[in-house]
Amino acid sequence: MATREAQARWRSRHQLVKKQLNVMAKHLIHEDLEEIARDYDLKGKGEAVTFATFVTKAMRQQAEYNPEAKRIMDLLENAYKRDRDIYRP
């Protein structure tokens, strides 16, 4: 974890464009983020989170006019909600 001084410098430097996100997650999620970062040549778990939100947003946009994308999003949403206890921190 970054030192308090390093965090203060980061916040000062990026205060107008970024917000720090600290999230408690199960070990499984951390492993998944590391895998996503490795598989897509990203710069660590933070960028993997950003990529995951990018993919989700793109799929939501596709689902607005693509029935297959909507079907896949519905399946993923239902599967997550069914198994959310596995992923909950």
Label each PLM-derived region with a short phrase.
Residues 12, 38-42, 58:
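Secondary-structure boundary motif
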Residues 43-70:
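Short, basic amphipathic alpha-helical segments that act as recognition/interaction helices
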